[in-house]
Amino acid sequence: MTTEEAFVKVLQMHGIEHAFGIIGSAFMPISDIFPDAGITFWDVAHETNGGLIADGYTRSTGKMSMVIAQNGPGITGLVTPIKTAYWNHTPLLLVTPQAANKTMGQGGFQEVEQMNLFKDMVCYQEEVRDPSRMAEVLNRVIEKAIRGSAPAQINVPRDYWTQVVDIELPPIVRLERQGGGAEAINKAAKLLSNAKFPVILSGAGVVIGGAIEEAKKLAEKLDSPVCSGYQHNDSFPGSHPLAVGPLGYNGSKAAMELISKADVVLALGTRLNPFSTLPGYGIDYWPKSASIIQVDINPDRIGLTKKVTVGISGDAKLVAQQIFDKLSSNAGDIDRQKRKDLIHQTKSAWLQKLSSLDHEDDDEGTVWNKEARERDKDRMSPRQAWRAIQAGMPEDVIISSDIGNNCAIGNAYPTFEKPRKYLAPGLFGPCGYGFPSILGAKIGCPDTPVIGFAGDGAFGISMNEMSSCARKEWPAITMVIFRNYQWGAEKRNTTLWFDNNFVGTELDPELSYAKVADACGLKGVTVKTMEETTSAIKKSCEDQKKGITTFIEVILNQELGEPFRRDAMKKPVRVAGIKKEDMKKQAALNN
């Protein structure tokens, strides 16, 4: 067989049906046989978007996909999405065609050190050293991505294609996930059995490992509140009486108040990243004297950010099952009714407040939000918009959220009954995630309604994909764009620490993304009231069934929520002083 046939046959062995990228000569020998192999090549407008589409596809389906691009400048466009997928624990196949071996090191056309480029962004990488090893290496890279729940890279010199090799296809070797050590399981079960106020923190590992039912059994046995990890609102059913919402930035105040009372925390399937447990609503809620049981598939992340009493390296589902089996018969009985009452009261109070919360507060000594309300009295606030959106969303919807102020304000609102319903940029935090990732989700789940969210700044980064999704073979989506004509997160920083000296924070109010959508052959809608917003959301989700993609511009006032990095910002101090008069004229360098 040829090397490209060997490559594609391994893809078929693993059921990889979708590839995302921009066509390039360095991999045309394999893309040429994609149609015959049952592999769909989604030709995107930009490689960065292609990688984020792949992230959305895999996270919404649990199935691997592949990203590929031309060597050199095409491959460099994949840096942001691959690092995003790494911190989202998304297993992706990264295929990097390389400049030809015979010219490497000569500074040839489109040459770059592609292995070095991704070495800190993938769980495994390998270069094909000989054409006869094409299938072997690809099979191993795919297996490593699955085991590591992260992207893995195969680097292929382009002169290794179109060669005939006499090989057999390698076998697939799937390893069973580990369930942790017996001693650690016993310790965890004993701590939870004797706890007065146990709390479960449900993370990404619960979604990835399919452990929601096991988390429910534990929670119900213990009558413990269940907090969802930051950006993992789909890691526990929102309608469950013990679900108290997400921790982290703009999350659930109820979750923060309840976890602060914990004497034992079961952090299930989470690396406890530091940003997701920062103080919120003025509450420094992480329970510093509690016993912490951390469960993570990756042993290197246990105890990395928090003091841990018991660390368990293992699959969230298997670990939760074993802990449940080891609980004492009276586990959870201590103060059970008192705890149940407190959960109900705290949760009810927060939901009541959230349902009537219309506006953002100003820090003492600042007036930006007050002035924003007065300046645009007829416009919705971000919170009013989010409530209107919630009222229009179908129950089984998949949503993706970009990074940014208006999207972040929405963290406390969406709840889900099933996993793989909530896509977010994760801790790498790239702007421009919301639009491409929801395209990937719809490709993977064509019969499910989907809605993407982005601010007008973040949307501008990925808006070129409008030219892709307008084509007839692309599925229909709904994309919501919050229009407040500013880079909100950075503007919030400016109002708090830089005396409203706005540099680079303003966006063009004359630009209409709805009109851009119309020009692309898509449907553009502009809404200005809560009623219009709810109606547009409902209509657009119905229109998806008819193959109609809708971009909804939601016109907002310029209120700004809590800053992302209050922990990292401070008022600057001027020492030497800066004056325009000190700027020297620069002569052209060739003079």
Indicate residue ranges for each PLM-predicted region.
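Active-site diphosphate/adenylate-binding microenvironment
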Residues: 4-7, 22-25, 30-35, 348-445
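Flexible, glycine/charged-enriched surface loops at secondary-structure junctions
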Residues: 151-153, 331-350, 357-361, 551
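Short beta-strand segments
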Residues: 155, 400-402, 553
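A short, charged, Gly/Pro-tolerant segment at domain boundaries
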Residues: 157-162, 342-353, 557-560
